[in-house]
Amino acid sequence: MKPWGSMKLNIYGESHSELLGLTMEVPKGVALDEELIFRDIARRKSGMIGSTPRRESDIPIYVSGVTGGVTNGDILNVRFENADIRSADYNKTRTLPRPSHCDYPAYVKYGYMPSGGGRFSGRLTLPLVFAGAVARQILRDKGVAVGSHYLKIGNVSDSAFDPLHTSSAQLCALRQKDFPTISPEAETDMKAAISALKGDSLGGCVELCALGLPVGLGGELWGGLESSISSLMYAIPGVKAVEFGAGTEFAAMHGSLANDGLRINGGVITFESNNSGGIQAGMANGAPIIVRVTFRPTPSIALPQHTIDLDSMQNADIAVSGRHDGCIALRGLAAGEAALLLAILDAFMEEA
């Protein structure tokens, strides 16, 4: 697989391999903020309500690219250990592909079903989140802030970001919360919906916002911000939809309402609305970047489902045991932020 972007990001390892990690090109002289990095890693860590019981230390081990806590200009190579592996959980179903998981297409492509999802596992979002934390540091010095919240879990919805007036203070406050929602009531109801799961799973939607991008950042065609952001968002397991601004609501709009009018207020160019989500023609327009990422319900559930036995080629049933997230959107939030941060940093690097 080719590395991603100007930073040549590459993620290696699997869900049940001894190690996993990443390599990426990082400018020389970045003093790594360990507190920031560990905070972002903790936000995707298991242990929260609705997440897998799998426990890993998730401590970054620096192989190269760092001297005395500062990047030295060499390729940054960071790895993590996989210690809490239970491959035996998959032995009973090794010929039964889990519905809507990677199992069947991976079996056809590679000749086997990868243990724990292999390279298709959400475990690989750990190095992605680490890379995003490094990007957050670099972008912070450029005045860029990124934050997010759970917009929807099951049938419970949170208040949306104000598309024109979301502040960096609000984004910072959300990042400090263990269960980031704008409305306290939404947090309570979402947690109740997750706690009520009995062997099933829930889908969810994360809303992200980025502030401080200079007007014109991005480009045309596949060099545009939407293209870059989407390509990384869809690298996150379970993501099935990515929307910008009004997103699918554009289908019911007239242009007279969809267009974001411009005004001069106090000598400053402003917008009357932000249906474009801060991006026009692949370039930042100065308004907040608003992105919504929808996650499917976790495919691995304990309820009986229809499948097939690949050995006997007969119909079969499967109830998945093992340790799985009840709602992958919960830990997917940190991965989504990382993807947005990396895509924005990549746009800056393209123009350097």
Where would I find each of the regions flagged by the language model?
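Generic N-terminal targeting/processing segments that precede catalytic cores or assembly contacts
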Residues: 2-352
